[in-house]
Amino acid sequence: MDIIDAFATKNKCYQAAIPLYPQGIMLHSIGTPQPSAAVLARYFDQYQPGGQSVCVHAFVQADGTVYQTLPWETIAWHCGGAANDTHIGVEMTEPSAGMSYAEPAEQITGTYRTAVALFAQLCEMYSLDPLADGVIIGHAEGHRRGVASNHADPELLWNTYGMGFTMDGFRQDVYAEMHKNDEEDDEDMIRYNMIEEVPSWAREEARRLIDRGALQGGTDGRLDLSEDMLRTMIVCQRMIDEAKET
């Protein structure tokens, strides 16, 4: 994902510079056949785009590019309701020829993935739980909650093209994106399942911990002891032994 600074400095919203303390993120789709986030960013870089006081924090497109138009901690006028004061607003671009676009699935899927990556980064940045109630919502969900105007996005876009995407699925995908490195680290972590597998430098102390019942395996007899856990236990044991000697 590539985030490009494209701040809409001419926009009334940017100039107002009202502080935002992000409590969530709202997902939108632009509602017009325009796949270029750069084009949209330029359009919103005017005092009142289309004669309206509107702006979002960012536009995302299918190739992984994000055009950021407002600082994340500035209120955006993106949903016509109270969520403006609590949520970052992000717009997805849409297929260039609307209903007759030759490859809408590729465009929409790419934009969806870019949005997932951005939302995951923002959730990490602001310590937000993507699965918590009301943290990540679509514009339509915001309306049902009474915090946004009456719009049907982004589900309208997904449903129109039969993509099968849902906001529940989006939240799950953001969560998975945030934790994918955890899974990779866990897979790479060295584990010891038998005392014979424990390195010689720690084996004797590990035996003592097992004999004392401080280190126990599962019901199948496997220790399932990670290298990090082993080092921590050995260091603690040695500190205890040194304290006893003094």
Regions found by a protein language model. Name each.
Residues 81-93:
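Short coil-to-beta-strand
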Residues 2-8, 15-19, 95-188:
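Basic/polar, cationic surfaces and motifs that engage anionic cell-wall
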Residues 1-84:
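N-terminal catalytic cores of peptidoglycan-degrading enzymes
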Residues 20, 83, 104-112, 195-202, ...:
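Solvent-exposed, acidic/flexible segments
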Residues 184-246:
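Short, solvent-exposed alpha-helical surface patches in non-cytosolic proteins
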Residues 54-55, 110-121, 169, 197-204, ...:
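Extracytoplasmic/secreted proteins, especially bacterial periplasmic and envelope-associated proteins
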Residues 71, 120-127, 175-179, 210-214, ...:
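Sec-exported extracytoplasmic/periplasmic mature domains
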